[in-house]
Curated annotation (Swiss-Prot):
It comes from the Eukaryota. It catalyses: L-seryl-[protein] + ATP = O-phospho-L-seryl-[protein] + ADP + H(+); L-threonyl-[protein] + ATP = O-phospho-L-threonyl-[protein] + ADP + H(+). Serine/threonine-protein kinase involved in the control of the cell cycle; essential for meiosis, but dispensable for mitosis. Triggers duplication of centrosomes and DNA. Acts at the G1-S transition to promote the E2F transcriptional program and the initiation of DNA synthesis, and modulates G2 progression; controls the timing of entry into mitosis/meiosis by controlling the subsequent activation of cyclin B/CDK1 by phosphorylation, and coordinates the activation of cyclin B/CDK1 at the centrosome and in the nucleus. InterPro entries: CDK (IPR050108), Kinase-like_dom_sf (IPR011009), Prot_kinase_dom (IPR000719), Protein_kinase_ATP_BS (IPR017441), Ser/Thr_kinase_AS (IPR008271). One of its GO terms (biological process) is signal transduction. SMART domains: S_TKc (SM00220). The modification Phosphotyrosine is found at residue 15. Its EC number is 2.7.11.22. The gene is cdk2. Phosphorylation at Thr-14 or Tyr-15 inactivates the enzyme, while phosphorylation at Thr-160 activates it. This is Cyclin-dependent kinase 2. CDD domains: STKc_CDK2_3 (cd07860).
Amino acid sequence: MESFQKVEKIGEGTYGVVYKAKNKVTGETVALKKIRLDTETEGVPSTAIREISLLKELNHPNIVKLHDVIHTENKLYLVFEFLHQDLKRFMDSSTVTGISLPLVKSYLFQLLQGLAFCHSHRVLHRDLKPQNLLINAQGEIKLADFGLARAFGVPVRTYTHEVVTLWYRAPEILLGCKYYSTAVDIWSLGCIFAEMITRKALFPGDSEIDQLFRIFRTLGTPDESIWPGVTSMPDYKPSFPKWARQDLSKVVPPLDEDGRDLLGQMLIYDPNKRISAKNALVHRFFRDVTMPVPPLRL
């Protein structure tokens, strides 16, 4: 750790404090994530170290690069490339004008490229949300915290006792499915796509049941005909209210037909039928994709 000079605290992630820091040797600015583990007494689990070390191999322009893993007695520091802003802050600052459609399209396309790459390496994210999508002034967007969920688990609360958001969580996870697939990340990205378009969260639930019911009220309560096996999931209840599906044109009115079609395929209940990142990249919505520069106020 001696080779890094902390510049300032830039945030509090799910697992610990994040600092902007400078590598004293190279002069490079990095993001230092200090991982707080409950196992303070036992030190860092070796499984976590192994998992995290594998992530150093994930090299892709739309994945935040993990430069190094620094392991001291019972602390773990992850050294990441530094980016100026996250998508949540950018959306919050763009509430008046919103994010332009070409920029939404570019961001979604880039995020799908990052997802397709990770999924092809059998790495899931499991906790995608606007806070861990990072942007720069060149128009790039990158996925942060990839693979951390598998190494450390997704806690119910952060180390500062903040509730970890459920807004982007796939229905199969909410219904108690223990074995899930890359499709959970596509669901999360679908929710983020809608939020970039409408400027408000698609399903802002405040508990697991509220989260499920918000999804059901919009997409209809799922049954065996549209999602085979749903009624035998651990947390499925036959007493769930039966809501009818709403038309997506009412849910995301600014979006054109191609955009609605893609969103609909990202939000399919049955994870086996949900579109993959690879197939989403060739959807006609992206036939005119460009890479505009965001109006960043850094």
